[in-house]
Amino acid sequence: MRRDPAHPVVHVEYPDWLDSVVDWNLAYPTDEERMRLAIAVARMNVERATGGPFGAAIFEAPSGRLVAVGMNSVVRLNNCTLHGEMMAFMMAQARVASFTLNAPHLPVHELFTSCEPCAMCLGATLWSGVQRVVYGATREDASQLDFDEGPVFPESYHYLEERGIRIVRSVLRDEARAVLEMYRAKGGTIYNG
C-alpha cells in the first residue's frame, strides 16, 4: 500500500547491529559499566556509519537492569530530534508503556549518555522521568567537532537539580571523547554546526 505523502508515518527503529553490542539480560551494576555501554553504542554507530558519535542508555537503579539504549540517528532516519538521548527516552517509555519513567509503579531510572546533553536533550530530560543523568564527554568536546549544542547554561543544570535530578559529569570522558575523534577522522557529517 502506498502512503499519501501528505500523511507521513514516522518509524523509529534500532539499527541491525544493536544486538551484537547489547546484552539485554545483563545487569550493569556500576556507573563505569553503564557508561561503557553508552560509549560502545556510540562507537558502533560510528564504525557502522549509521549515525553520529553519540550513544545513550537508560537503566533501572539500583539494579542496573538495562531498559533501553539510543544512538544518534539524525541522518539515518532524517529526523533532527533523533539524538541518542531522545531515542533512549522514546524506547524506554515504549518498553515500560508509560509517558514518564517516573510513574509511581516504576523503579527509579537513570540516563547514561556518552556526551553531555544538548539543549533539546537536556530539556527532554526534565520530562522523561529519569532521576539521574551521567555523561562522559563534555559539550566543549562536542563543540571541537563543530557540533552546536545549543543554549545550555549552568542554570539549566541547577533547574534539573532543584527538581531532584542528579547530574554526574565526565565519567570515562577520555573514552567517550575518543569516539568523537574517531567520527571526525572518518569525516562524519556535522549536521547541526
Language-model-detected regions and their locations in the chain:
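Short, solvent-exposed cationic patches
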Residues: H83-L101
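Short beta-strand scaffold segments in enzyme catalytic cores
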Residues: F54-G64
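Immediate flanking context of iron-sulfur cluster ligation sites
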Residues: N102-E116
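Zinc-dependent deaminase
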Residues: M1-N45, A124, S128-G193
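A structural microfeature
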Residues: V67-A68
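Short loop/turn motifs at secondary-structure junctions and domain boundaries
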Residues: E47-G51
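A short, polar/charged loop-to-alpha-helix boundary motif
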Residues: S73-M87
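Conserved redox-active cysteine motifs that mediate thiol-disulfide chemistry
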Residues: C115, A119-L122, W127
